[in-house]
Design a protein with these regions (language model features):
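Blade-edge motifs of beta-propeller repeat domains
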Residues: 20-33, 68-84, 118-136, 166-183, ...
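Beta-propeller blade termini
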Residues: 36-43, 87-96, 138-146, 186-193, ...
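Glycine-aliphatic tripeptides that mark coil-to-beta-strand junctions in extracellular
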Residues: 47-53, 98-104, 150-154, 197-203, ...
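Residue-level detector of functionally pivotal "anchor" positions at catalytic/ligand-binding pockets or at interdomain
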Residues: 376-389, 489-513
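Recognizes extended acidic, P/S/T-rich segments that occur
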Residues: 416-463
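Beta-strand-rich modules
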Residues: 460-480
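Extracellular fibronectin type III
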Residues: 475-494
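C-terminal outer-membrane/trafficking sorting elements
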Residues: 496-575
């Protein structure tokens, strides 16, 4: 009998340890903020994540500040950043100098503002006159290299307009006529929905009367609206994340529906440019963030939603554990409730699990800093993925594809791993694309996925003649980066072959044949390249020889390259 009670006691103690409060409210020195934005970034490249925070302070005044992480303690640094409220911010190394820059949009006493700050190092930030759209309160913005030239580009939406800016690579930006719908109180997110190597754009918000969601498929820099049954929402968030680890990005949307009732939706990506509603059982939430995160280091993306719920005065912050079978269970995390909220996740103390900053209004303006103590509560410590290898390159004119073998990870499924590329014109340089990671250790400077997404390849267009050197790292669901691979290289020759982004190959697919139309009289070379950059076959085509058999091709995505009279045309082909 004594042994029986001892067993029960040990079981209870184990359960108490397992379900002990995983998030510890920690004194951080961060000010109480509402109607704002917050982000982790290693601004001084010292291998720990600093914090930038902006919004409305406890006296209802605009506020903005940077806090340096000193071994887990945060120190306010005078930077001269102009305060904004009702704001959004986004981190990127827009000038490829190895320091994390940021853009912020919102309002202050002078009206609507959008500011770009260049990080000069040592917490010195220079305000850059970029000429960005002043979108106003409740707007959003996001960085991505939409045209595959290595430089981060920027989309801004709010006040019924959406504007895309192409990074010229010289510190300036050019407005692009992309045909994107104008929105109010939007949420924006970039992600490769069709796994073709181009970042696609997800938008959710007020498009005129009710909440709408739009997906723009990026086809070599041209955006085409995808017809879907996805329902959008107003005053919430929209994010990409691979919830079921099938290699396809799923969607999380929160906000208010047409009846002004808070909702939370999950849509599963079927892998064929269609999406299915997933009954995830989430509580409807608006006026706050929605995050895909792996808080428990099991390799599955969990969900946090914070903000206003249905009913007068109701608000909550809820954490949902991914059960690994496409369903979610609420986890009793004990997080503070707030609306007009913002959040940031990152491993600030480098202990192998991601921690949480939560800001918002819960009677008063508040900021909570939660240290994730799951490792001490019998959860596993995260480890980095293996280093990518088997680097491969395909080069045609000023076009190049680099690819690699997929990594593995002890916690994250292989399909969930994202990849991050650094590349420059000299060994070890990043003047073509920045990884926002330490090149020596792989330590991440931001809490984000890799710049290649879940693809095992990355496309570059409009490259200048010269030598190129690149390395690749793998990043798991908890944003832990592997070391970088061995260095690969390739050369772009100064040939007369030029790509044309706006002309496509004119072709039709008939069964197992590709029929090429409008070919020149002179013979041209057609190359079929797999999505990961491997050359499958080459053919000489002409007016009299315009059919290519595809019987031997496996189902998948391929790129057709037609070198026609010194002009390289490219089109995507799906078998």
């Amino acid at each position: 009998m004594k042994q029986f009670y001892t067993a029960i006691l040990l079981s209870l103690l184990a359960s108490a340890t397992l379900f002990a409060q995983p998030f510890v409210n920690t004194v951080s020195g961060l000010p109480g903020i509402g109607r704002g934005a917050v982000a982790f970034a290693d601004f001084d490249n010292d291998h720990d994540l600093d914090v930038i925070i902006s919004g409305q302070d406890i006296n209802y005044n605009p506020y903005a500040a940077v806090f340096r992480n000193d071994a887990g303690l945060f120190t306010h640094i005078e930077t001269g950043i102009i305060p904004l409220e009702n704001c959004a911010l986004a981190i990127a190394d827009y000038d490829l100098d190895g320091f994390q820059d940021f853009v912020i949009t919102g309002v202050n006493l002078e009206g609507s503002k959008t500011f770009l700050y260049r990080n000069l190092g040592n917490f010195q930030f220079e305000l850059i006159p970029a000429g960005f759209y002043n979108a106003g309160a409740g707007s959003d913005l996001a960085w991505a290299d939409y045209n595959s030239d290595g430089f981060p580009d920027l989309v801004i939406s709010g006040n019924w307009q959406t504007k895309l800016y192409s990074n010229n690579g010289d510190g300036t930006f050019a407005l692009v006529e992309a045909g994107l719908v104008g929105m109010n109180t939007p949420s924006l997110a970039w992600g490769d929905a069709d796994n073709d190597g181009d970042p696609d754009l997800l938008m959710s918000g007020d498009a005129g009367s009710v909440g709408e969601a739009y997906i723009y498929i990026n086809d070599q820099g041209i955006f085409n609206l995808l017809e879907t049954q996805i329902e959008g929402a107003v005053g919430g968030d929209a994010q990409w994340g691979d919830a079921d680890n099938d290699g396809n990005l799923d969607i999380l949307i929160t906000g208010k529906d047409a009846s002004l009732i808070p909702v939370s939706y999950v849509y599963r990506n079927n892998g064929d440019k269609t999406f299915s509603f997933a009954n995830a059982g989430l509580v409807g939430t608006a006026l706050g963030p929605a995050n895909w995160i792996d808080y428990d280091n099991d390799g599955d993306l969990d969900i946090m939603v914070a903000g206003q719920n249905a009913g007068c005065g109701n608000a909550s912050t809820r954490l949902y554990t991914n059960n690994g079978i496409g369903s979610f269970s609420e986890f009793p995390a004990g997080l503070a409730f707030a609306e007009r909220a913002a959040s940031a996740w990152g491993d600030y103390d480098n202990d192998g699990d991601i921690d949480l900053i939560l800001t918002g209004i819960s009677g008063i303006h508040t900021t909570k800093f939660y240290r994730n103590d799951l490792i001490t509560n019998s959860f596993q410590q995260n480890t980095p993925p293996t280093v990518p290898d088997n680097l491969y390159t395909y080069v045609a004119g000023d076009y190049a594809v680099i690819s690699w073998a997929r990594s593995t990870d002890a916690q994250s499924p292989q399909n969930s791993i994202t990849y991050n590329v650094m590349m420059g014109n000299n060994p070890g340089s990043i003047n073509v694309i920045s990884p926002m990671s330490d090149a020596q250790t792989g330590k991440r400077h931001t809490s984000s996925t890799g710049n290649a997404g879940q693809n095992d390849f990355l496309v570059f267009r409009n490259l200048q003649p010269g030598d190129y050197y690149f390395r690749v790292q793998a990043i798991d669901q908890a944003y832990e980066g592997s070391a970088f691979s061995q260095e690969g290289s390739f050369t772009v020759l100064g040939t007369d072959v030029k790509t044309n982004e706006h002309r496509k190959i004119d072709f039709n697919v008939l069964g197992d044949r590709i029929i090429l139309n409008n070919l020149p009289e002179k013979p041209s070379k057609l190359s079929i390249v797999s999505a990961d950059g491997k050359l499958i076959s080459e053919h000489t085509v002409s007016v009299s020889n315009s059919e290519i058999g595809t019987q031997k091709l496996l189902p998948g995505i391929y790129i057709l390259h037609l070198n026609s009279e010194g002009l390289l045309l490219s089109s995507k082909f799906v078998k």
